[in-house]
């Protein structure tokens, strides 16, 4: 009997030890999960205050493509502008999030974008999300979605640890604000809904409410000043110059040298949109005069202008050596290799 009792005691002790081990493992797992959640919730600020998320010329065209590192982030036109990624060879396409996406800014661990799920089809799951519009931050792996502003927003620019963006208020209308990438310190910079173009710690914009002059404003706020008078729209910055369209001259393309404040007319025809190579050597633009409509390229040194493809296109985006663009009616998308000017269909596979 004593031997049997010892065996029972040993079995009971082993059972208690096993339970304690399981309890310790569960506690450690919970601690690990909690630590991982805290780490993911913690905002990773940029060390470089000069960090940017996209070019002003891409943002002029809706910010549907952006690049960070070796990855291109884009709004897939064949999946209701859902957020996707691919490598720089236009392969390994992956869906990141189901939002209708525009004004993409990408840098480091994060992607910032404007959500417009009100434009989604009625059968889309994204239409039933908590908020159909707003400014959002998401990790590049598709996790950790964070709402930074919940009402409609439009163009946005990432600079360092701040986002300069147009936000809509039902009482005040469209205004220019600055917010931290953590969603804190949301500060109004301008009462008018100017589209911000940022370079050298300065915000450039064309007036909206009282004039269409070209203005500048410090990124820290203060009083804006006029740097060039006229009737301009479609502003962007490339390589020390501002590009814009002159509304007094039938929307012809112009360039303002910021060092001399000399304005040069680059085209003599009406254009609808444009994009500029990063070195300013070439401008790709859409002629919109009703007779010669098409995609053209301008050599800014020689002044030579060449039609690359006839038709009506928009959303011109330059990423590395590629120009992405779409049919005006959204029926097809294309990509052109800037080296040989060969145009192909761009039809990324749709993921569920």
Language-model region placement:
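A short loop-to-beta-strand structural motif that recurs across blades of beta-propeller domains
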Residues: 82-84, 134-136, 175-177, 213-215, ...
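N-terminal Sec-pathway targeting helices
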Residues: 9-30
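Short loop/turn segments that connect beta-strands within beta-propeller blades
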Residues: 87-91, 139-143, 179-184, 217-222, ...
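Beta-strand-rich domains and repeat architectures in extracellular enzymes and scaffolds
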Residues: 50-83, 98-104
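A short beta-strand motif characteristic of beta-propeller blades
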Residues: 45-57, 91-97, 143-149, 184-189, ...
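Repeated scaffold domains used in trafficking and secretory/extracellular systems
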Residues: 59-66, 99-108, 150-160, 190-200, ...
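Blade-level signature of beta-propeller repeat domains, shared across WD40, Kelch, NHL, RCC1
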Residues: 310-352
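Beta-strand C-termini and the immediately following turn/loop, strongest in propeller blades
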Residues: 68, 73-78, 107-131, 159-171, ...
């Amino acid at each position: 009997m004593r031997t049997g009792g010892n065996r029972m005691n040993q079995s009971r002790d082993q059972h208690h030890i096993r339970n304690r081990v399981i309890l310790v493992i569960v506690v450690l797992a919970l601690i690990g999960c909690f630590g991982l959640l805290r780490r993911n919730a913690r905002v990773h600020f940029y060390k470089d205050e000069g960090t940017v998320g996209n070019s002003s010329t891409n943002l002029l065209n809706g910010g549907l493509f952006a690049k960070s590192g070796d990855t291109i982030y884009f709004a897939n036109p064949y999946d209701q502008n859902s957020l996707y990624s691919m490598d720089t060879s236009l392969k390994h396409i992956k869906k990141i999030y189901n939002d209708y996406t525009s004004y993409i800014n990408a840098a480091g661990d994060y992607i910032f974008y404007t959500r417009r799920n009100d434009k989604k089809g009625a059968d889309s799951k994204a239409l039933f999300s908590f908020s159909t519009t707003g400014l959002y931050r998401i990790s590049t792996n598709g996790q950790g979605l964070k709402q930074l502003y919940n009402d409609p927003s439009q163009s946005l620019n990432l600079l360092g640890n701040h986002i300069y963006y147009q936000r809509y208020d039902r009482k005040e209308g469209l205004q220019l604000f600055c917010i931290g990438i953590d969603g804190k310190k949301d500060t109004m910079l301008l009462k008018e809904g100017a589209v911000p173009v940022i370079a050298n710690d300065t915000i450039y914009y064309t007036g909206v409410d009282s004039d269409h002059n070209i203005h500048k404003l410090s990124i820290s706020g203060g009083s804006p000043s006029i740097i060039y008078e006229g009737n301009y729209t479609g502003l962007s910055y490339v390589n020390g110059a501002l590009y814009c369209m002159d509304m007094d001259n039938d929307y012809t393309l112009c360039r303002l040298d910021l060092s001399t404040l000399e304005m040069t007319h680059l085209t003599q025809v009406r254009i609808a949109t444009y994009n500029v190579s990063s070195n300013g050597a070439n401008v790709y633009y859409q002629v919109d005069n009703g007779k010669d409509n098409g995609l053209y390229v301008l050599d800014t040194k020689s002044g030579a202008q060449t039609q690359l493809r006839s038709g009506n296109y928009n959303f011109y985006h330059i990423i590395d050596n590629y120009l992405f663009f779409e049919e005006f009616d959204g029926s097809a998308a294309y990509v052109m290799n800037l080296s040989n000017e060969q145009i192909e269909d761009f039809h990324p596979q749709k993921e569920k």
